[in-house]
Amino acid sequence: MTFSPEPAHQHGQPPRTAILLINLGTPDAPTPKAVGRYLKAFLSDPRVVEIPRLAWLPILHGLILPFRSRASAMKYESIWLREAHMTGSPLLVYTERQAHALQLLMQQQGHDVTVACAMRYGNPSIESVMEALRRQGTEQILLLPLYPQFSGTTTATAFDEAFRVLSTWRNQPELRLVKHFHDHPAYISALHKQVGGYWAQHGKPDFARGDKLILSFHGLPRRLLDLGDPYHCECLKTGRLLGEALGLQPGQFQVTFQSRFGKAEWLQPYTAPTLAELGKVGTQRVDVFCPGFPADCIETLEEIAMEGQSEFRLAGGQDFHFIPCLNDAEAWIAGLADIALQHLQGWPLNVPHPHELEARRSRAQARGAGA
């Protein structure tokens, strides 16, 4: 293995600390070519698809990519942002806004911490962002995947990629990991405020007449639960804590799982059939919120807000409400700061005064020291 050269060391340079927010990823454009490139990277990850490579790769390249790329590109086109202040993939736009807002809040709190964001698949890549942090002299990095509920298919593969990048560095930084925050009070509070704020503006469901709040999480193959992946249990706990915070009874809200892929059994109940059944039995209003997605993306804006609404109404339902994800809501940015600071304890979060830095450089140079 070849190890990359390190940036030149500067005497007296203070150790810098960074928070790296990591999300799943997105294509660079809503085109079949860009979507195909993204899907290839995503679905080639053995953490995501646990099928022997010799069996899976011919299926991926021969069947899935040629047909799914074009269909998925049309879906991305339907939700692509083209506003003056927000252009591009919603997932990337909102993740970047989260990083920027968290950076400002940390500065306001007196913490000199760099906040960056990266994608596990696509751009900006984990490797490119970590290399940029290295050039800035970063010596402590907190990896904070934006997956509230841990799964080997999401959080673990983000960690894998960061470890792979570091395996080529000569001078490695200190590293800390946020495994999950599915039951963190700041996260639950942000979810509570997001739903409560929506209801304050658009009215609250009439639970007495049978209206329902659906909490839709991304699904996983059922066999992963049997193999020990904790994701399902953590989703249920998040749902229970949010329901309690909202003061709801068990029958007034329901946890479901979306985005099933393939024919194998996934975590149930499935979101789409649940919405269709609610419409069929005459439910007048359904609100859908996706607590496992801190930023709106194709799974929320297209699969739920568009397809889910259609499922419900075609089956006879009337009033469908999609509650936006946390995105860059003030309560969520404050929650992110709370989560990050809990894991940053003991690391330097303040840069010394310039006079002190100059004094350090002078002392180091006078002694001929290398640090």
UniProtKB/Swiss-Prot annotation:
Belongs to the ferrochelatase family. This is Ferrochelatase. One of its GO terms (molecular function) is metal ion binding. One of its GO terms (cellular component) is cytoplasm. It comes from Cupriavidus metallidurans (strain ATCC 43123 / DSM 2839 / NBRC 102507 / CH34) (Ralstonia metallidurans). Keywords: Cytoplasm, Heme biosynthesis, Iron, Lyase, Metal-binding, Porphyrin biosynthesis. InterPro entries: Ferrochelatase, Ferrochelatase_AS, Ferrochelatase_C, Ferrochelatase_N. The gene is hemH. PANTHER family: FERROCHELATASE, FERROCHELATASE, MITOCHONDRIAL.
